[in-house]
From Swiss-Prot:
<dbReference type="GO" id="GO:0000055">
    <property type="term" value="P:ribosomal large subunit export from nucleus"/>
</dbReference>
<dbReference type="GO" id="GO:0044614">
    <property type="term" value="C:nuclear pore cytoplasmic filaments"/>
</dbReference>
<keyword id="KW-0539">Nucleus</keyword>
<dbReference type="GO" id="GO:0031965">
    <property type="term" value="C:nuclear membrane"/>
</dbReference>
<dbReference type="GO" id="GO:0044612">
    <property type="term" value="C:nuclear pore linkers"/>
</dbReference>
<dbReference type="GO" id="GO:0005643">
    <property type="term" value="C:nuclear pore"/>
</dbReference>
<dbReference type="GO" id="GO:0006606">
    <property type="term" value="P:protein import into nucleus"/>
</dbReference>
<comment type="subunit">
    <text>Component of the nuclear pore complex (NPC). NPC constitutes the exclusive means of nucleocytoplasmic transport. NPCs allow the passive diffusion of ions and small molecules and the active, nuclear transport receptor-mediated bidirectional transport of macromolecules such as proteins, RNAs, ribonucleoparticles (RNPs), and ribosomal subunits across the nuclear envelope.</text>
</comment>
<keyword id="KW-0813">Transport</keyword>
<keyword id="KW-0906">Nuclear pore complex</keyword>
<protein>
    <recommendedName>
        <fullName>Nucleoporin nup82</fullName>
    </recommendedName>
</protein>
<dbReference type="InterPro" id="IPR019321">
    <property type="entry name" value="Nucleoporin_Nup88"/>
</dbReference>
<dbReference type="GO" id="GO:0017056">
    <property type="term" value="F:structural constituent of nuclear pore"/>
</dbReference>
<keyword id="KW-0509">mRNA transport</keyword>
<dbReference type="GO" id="GO:0005635">
    <property type="term" value="C:nuclear envelope"/>
</dbReference>
<dbReference type="GO" id="GO:0006406">
    <property type="term" value="P:mRNA export from nucleus"/>
</dbReference>
<dbReference type="GO" id="GO:0000056">
    <property type="term" value="P:ribosomal small subunit export from nucleus"/>
</dbReference>
Amino acid sequence: MASTIMSQEVSWTDILEKHPALRWIKPIPEDWEIFPKHLCAFESFLYVAVGQEVRSLDCRLLKHKNEASHKNFYKKLFNPELDFMIEQICLSKNGRFLAVVGKSKIVILGLRSKLSEQNPLAESVSNFGESVNNFSNSEHQENGTNSLKLSEVTICSVAVINPSSQIVSVRFHPLGKSGRSLVVLTETSLLLYEAGNGVLMPDYEIPLKLTHQASNSFDADVDLHIPTAFCFSNVSQGWGVFTIYILTRGGDVFSVCPVMPANAMIPQDVLKQIRLILTKKEDDADAENHRRNVHWITKLLGEAALANDLSTSFVISEGSSELFDSSDYVSVRRPDDFSFIPSMQGPFLLQPAVADDELIEDYCDIYSFGMNPIDVLAIGGSEGRLDLLLLVSEVSGRWSKLNDHGLASMKLIVSQVHSLYLSNNNPYMVLQPDIQSPYSLIAYHANGLHVVDIESWARDLNLNFENSEFLNNEEENDEDELSNVLVSIPSRTSVLERLDTNPLNESTDAVVGCAQLYYPSLGKILISLTRNWQTTVFDDSDLATMGVNKESLSNEMDYSKSLGTSSLEQVDDLDEKLTYTPLYVSLLEKTPFTDPSIPSLVERTIVPAELQNEITVSSASLRFLGKVVARYRETLNLLDHGCSELHHRLKLQREEYERQQNHIYKLSDRISNFREKAWSTEHLEHLTSDMSMCEKRIDQVLQRVMDLRVPDLSDKEKQFIKEIGNYKEKVTGERGIEKRVETLKTLLQRTKPRDAQTTLVASSSDMRLAAIEQLQKLLAQQSLSIKELKTKTVSFQRLLQTS
């Protein structure tokens, strides 16, 4: 029984790292080709490709179920069409369809949706709901004491695709209705498919023309013109939602626009922006293309108007159990024209041009950040290099005749603004979006995983371009502002290394998959999978801390130091009478553990396979252990230095507390002496003079504060000045302490001993005792007010030092 119950102290992320669904029993040969994109996720479900099978895992069972049988449970998605080695898998946006990709075959599987389980109306939404929801549990297996439960689930294949050329990349179109529009990039063409039952033929085909040379001519750079990846433009305005960027091995970027699924869901805002294109005037050279764009847009708007008349106000989103307002989206069909097809545009000219020695010959992936109004593209190379490009030219719809597959003559320009060298000796690099921020992307390659963030400079760059006056203004100030943003891009681009799988530069354990889970009960999870089936999980605590640029940190520290020294110098320039001691200097100092050199992240490394089983002494093991020991030795040295600094800080605090305690003892002695001594008018006059001196000090401090801070006084400072005025009114007002002291003085003068009757002497002594008691209360109240006033002044002075 003890082996069947999972310990509650083990985190569910640790269980996920050792889950049997992410393991393969068969040994991996050394010459096995590396195929990335073996991992994808939707909400709490994780899908992984293992050999010729696809496994599904619900991460909610790992966190909310206590039995070991639930902890080790996963499903194997079985289909007779999966008879090939899987190279990549791709999931639709709504999580209903999974594309399993081989070298020359694609199988689209229909997955069970939450809507089909909860809402009976789902059957009317889907045209092939029976095939999608036809699940049958065929067997359950238990493996010894580990309680391994495997449920083999038969999935009816929605579609089978057999392209005529080798498959390069596969993605589901984000505008596709029901998520069944698949875009396939092969070595010769760009294909669009609408998922249905049986073997599919392409719904739309755009031949690739990646060079200006004739097809029958000799091309020395034919290997560089092979497509390697494509991505959708994430720009949500104008033509951007219909644009696809294609990357070649030589680093050339091409665009195809417009590319639209046969059945699409388009936002109303996009249609409003496209209407503006109808009023835009074009040059005479582009008159024919402008007429084609107007014809295509007019058909699209007609389909949208007809759909608005026939649709209801609220519909159920297919693949989800939520209602959404149909006034925000329009379901339209693609306006096909059988005599014209979208034309290839490019290649984009790189301005300014880079040197020949900086060029690499094998680019792998491309990604669009979707910035408005100027987009930022990222392209990754096999040598671990990541280039950031600004899309200077505006991409619009371009058309060509059906028999003419030439390139568009329009010159498009991109500008390379920064290059990052993430690693070396990489056969590939994969770029994918980050759920944490639209300004960041995840780049994983054979040697690890990095997160690149451009938010700090992308916002400033877009603000410059959004200003319409700036676009028509040639003043130097605006140009200088833009140039300052462009120059600061290298220093303001944040790069964080999440995983290092090659610490010795000799390992072959490459990252073959990366996925992100985002579910309310699970949080945000980043998962990576390596070739040797090593799984690494980063939860919210790991993802919360982002790398900070060292240069910006040093500038901020220098600025804070300059502010601190200037404020201390201003305090030292004050009169000695105005300084209140002791000051808590140690509390104003920065804690040593906020030093950015002390790492706050848990460093994750992949241990070599020879160290996981029986430890054998070899040169590689010794180098690895030496590197790990050196890293932790540096960290321990930093922590030791921080502990010594903290010990010194605590020592200063102890001395200050002891000094304050001695000061309190002295004050208590003085109070006891005051109580024992007889009160006289001279002593009251002395107290009155001290009170006036205190008022003068307060006035001087206020005057200096007003000179330094006006007109930039904060709300707390204004409130503090108001409180000081109230204290002054209590002391010097009509009903203040001074008036009451004057009355007591006259009362004491009247009660001096003189030759009188015993009854009068007795009455005068009683009056004297009553006056003394009242005076003691008044002095106690006065000392309390002065003490509060001193405390306020010290806190305000400390606030000035820290600001």
